[in-house]
Swiss-Prot record:
Keywords: Antimicrobial, Disulfide bond, Fungicide, Plant defense, Secreted, Signal. Transmembrane segments: none annotated. GO terms for biological process: defense response; defense response to fungus; killing of cells of another organism. InterPro entries: Defensin_plant, Scorpion_toxin-like, Scorpion_toxin-like_sf. This is Defensin-like protein P322. Gene3D superfamilies: Knottin, scorpion toxin-like (3.30.30.10). Disulfide bonds join 30-74, 41-61, 47-68, 51-70. Residues 1-19 form the signal peptide. It is found in: Secreted. Belongs to the DEFL family. Protease inhibitor I18 (RTI/MTI-2) subfamily. GO terms for cellular component: extracellular region.
Amino acid sequence: MRFFATFFLLAMLVVATKMGPMRIAEARHCESLSHRFKGPCTRDSNCASVCETERFSGGNCHGFRRRCFCTKPC
């Protein structure tokens, strides 16, 4: 019985370490269509740099029409 309890405790410890650290809840991000980006949005990095000039924290290309959407924490 003692062996089983030790084995069970070690198994639980291994399972707990495999789960990894708890994630902290992330802030929500608000999106807005960029007013200064021109042309089709093909690279997220170009979109993000234009959005930073519009006082946003970043930007991504979205949708079928590949438009630039700026993001910031709400």
